Amino acid sequence: MSNGDRLIWIDLEMTGLDPEQERIIEMASIITDSQLNIVAEGPVIAIHQPDSLLEQMDEWCTRTHGASGLTQRVKESTISEAEAEQQTLEFLGKHLEPGQSPLCGNSIGQDRRFLVKYMPKLEAFFHYRNLDVSTVKELARRWRPDVLEGVKKQGSHLALDDIRDSINELRHYRDHFFKL
């Protein structure tokens, strides 16, 4: 199997949803083959952001990132967005050439917006296409709601766990929704 068939999965945790106001606080990446088998796991990086930004998070982010321990990891981190971008690019470059893989994940359009704003070199590494599991979820919800019942997620809102959830969710749809 060609490395060109590999898929890059990325998840970001942010201080909110608006890239004009909010920032990235955690990122992780996984590379799979075309059959969704994990080939390699990239660095899981808590990205330092100032307390002033963390204090402005809405209630959901404050509660969720506080309960998971992410807020504390962000405060203790010394890694900048630029360093996180570089570490991730170095990892990806060991496994694929730029432009080979779409950006894969759940609601990945949101992650791409933050990458464009804060990590443009990383965003440029991906093919312009997206492989968005949430699109398949929306189709299943409309056409085969019974398929959704088998989807199991950790829901921790930690980047690496969320990627694993997305890969497992797509496996479920492949096995129960698509006729291959």
Swiss-Prot record:
UniProt keyword terms in alphabetical order: Cytoplasm, Exonuclease, Hydrolase, Nuclease
Pfam families the UniProt entry points to: RNase_T (PF00929)
Domain of life: Bacteria
Domain Exonuclease: 7-170
GO cellular component labels: cytoplasm
A GO molecular-function annotation: nucleic acid binding
InterPro entries: Exonuclease_RNaseT/DNA_pol3 (IPR013520), Oligoribonuclease (IPR022894), RNaseH-like_sf (IPR012337), RNaseH_sf (IPR036397)
Xref: CDD domains: Orn
GO biological process terms, semicolon-separated: DNA metabolic process
EC number: 3.1.15.-
Subcellular localization: Cytoplasm
Cysteine disulfide links: none
Enzyme class of the recorded protein, top EC level: hydrolase
Active site location: Y128
Record function comment: 3'-to-5' exoribonuclease specific for small oligoribonucleotides.
Family: Belongs to the oligoribonuclease family.
Listed NCBIfam families: PRK05359.1 (NF003765)
Protein name: Oligoribonuclease
